[in-house]
């Protein structure tokens, strides 16, 4: 029989949280499974809850100019949201900006990995400041846990369909303005994704439905896609006799 060559990889998962929320737990399960398979997997997160050495809380540089940079960016994002959410109807899911207070600073923490896997990264990874440069350095996989990567801010479009052309006049903002916050976010994402070589970013979805959404979207349509259902630890979840 032929010997099987197993190559271990050094992998970084980027996630807004490690275990708080369903998307974070899915990311953490993948990270844990990869480690059990012999890979050198790490998580870099905006909020750490688990007591695990391979999960790293991101704090960012603490210099005076860096703190001012984050404060200024945080204030601008909050001001734009405050102005744009005045007429927002009740009952919708989260709506998040493509920017984060960290901006480009996050790139300083991402070195010497074979591959980077993004997960639910809202309010943590600044897409325009991070993704184009990151994808030029290292292969990137983005595992989508909802629709946010392809929209102007919503995490589920509730049948709106604007993500297939261009966001604006957003129902989830209660907006009738074409150049509203959803259009601004959509256009910034379009510039960021436009600066990325299609071969440097792979989109992974846990369902065929979400994969079809990505394929039909203006923002993600050019990138290769794979459907990989969520994994479970079969030591915990396995058929048993009743």
PLM region descriptions:
Residues 1-8:
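Short, Lys/Arg-enriched N-terminal segments with co-localized hydrophobic residues
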Residues 9-242:
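Catalytic cores of nucleotide-sugar-dependent glycosyltransferases that transfer UDP/GDP/TDP-activated
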